[in-house]
C-alpha cells in the first residue's frame, strides 16, 4: 500500500490510528486511491486527523441511505435486493452532488 500510494509509513499509521483507513492484511484499489488522496492533501497541510469529520459525515450518509431504503431492505425478494443495489449508489452520488454544491458555493464566497 505504501509503495502503490506513495505514502510515508507515518502518514499511513496516522490514517489508521484516526480511523480513516482500517488496518488489513491487504488493500483494494479503493483504499490505494484513498491513500493517494490523503498523500496529496497532506502535501497541503491537511492531515488524516482533519479527515475524521469527513469519515463521520460519510457514515451519516450511509445511515441516511439505509433509512431511505429501509422498506426495500426489509423485503427478502431478489427484485427488492436488485433495486437496493441500484438505488444505493445513485443516492450516494446525489449526496456527493449536494456536498460538492455546498463546497463550491462556500468557496465562491471566500474566493470570488
Language-model regions, residue ranges each:
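Arg/Lys-rich, alpha-helical DNA-contact motif
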Residues: 3-112
Amino acid at each position: 500500500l505504501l509503495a502503490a500510494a506513495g505514502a510515508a509509513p507515518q502518514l499511513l499509521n496516522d490514517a489508521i490510528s484516526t480511523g480513516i483507513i482500517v488496518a488489513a492484511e491487504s488493500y483494494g484499489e479503493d483504499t490505494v486511491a484513498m491513500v493517494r488522496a490523503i498523500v496529496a492533501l497532506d502535501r497541503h497541510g491537511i492531515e488524516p486527523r482533519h479527515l475524521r469529520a469527513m469519515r463521520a459525515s460519510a457514515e451519516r450518509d450511509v445511515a441516511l441511505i439505509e433509512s431511505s431504503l429501509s422498506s426495500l431492505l426489509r423485503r427478502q425478494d431478489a427484485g427488492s435486493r436488485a433495486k437496493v443495489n441500484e438505488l444505493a449508489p445513485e443516492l450516494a452520488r446525489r449526496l456527493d452532488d449536494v456536498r460538492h454544491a455546498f463546497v463550491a458555493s462556500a468557496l465562491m464566497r471566500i474566493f470570488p
